[in-house]
Amino acid sequence: MLNLDTNIVIEGLTGGLTNHEIALLESESIAISDIVLWEISKLIQLQRISLDLESTEFRRMLAQLTVYPITAEIARQSTALDFRSDPADEIIAATSVVEKIPLLTRDRKILNSKIVPLAK
């Protein structure tokens, strides 16, 4: 299983994934933190991306995912990471730590972490 950062979900929906990212996604089941859905909604609201959350494509993608809720353990872990970022990124990274699943991300701060399990 792979946990996806928001940037990977958006690139997947807009056709911007690399061949390596596509290969990883095709070989694993997929999960996201529930805060990814909030981040996507905010980016749409701010007109930074153009996606339709009601589209058949988005609903189909969502039905194939495991969505992890923010738990007390994930919230605690988000404060014990070896990097500082925006709260959503910290929750996403902490989800990977707590659930012990690699995170697929392009975020440089997270990629430099020694704590967060990363997709290779």
Role assignments for model-derived ranges:
Residues 5-6, 40, 78, 96:
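Generic structural signal for small/hydrophobic residues in well-ordered secondary structure
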Residues 9-10, 37-40, 75, 110-111:
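A generic structural signal for short hydrophobic patches within well-formed alpha-helices
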Residues 1-32, 44-59:
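Short, well-structured N-terminal submotif of metal-dependent ribonuclease cores
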Residues 8-12, 31, 67, 100-105:
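Short, hydrophobic beta-strand segments that form beta-sheet elements in well-ordered domains
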Residues 57-82:
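Acidic catalytic patch
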Residues 93-120:
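Acidic, PIN/NYN-like endoribonuclease modules and their adjacent C-terminal/linker elements
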Residues 6, 72, 89-90:
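Conserved glycosyltransferase catalytic-site signature
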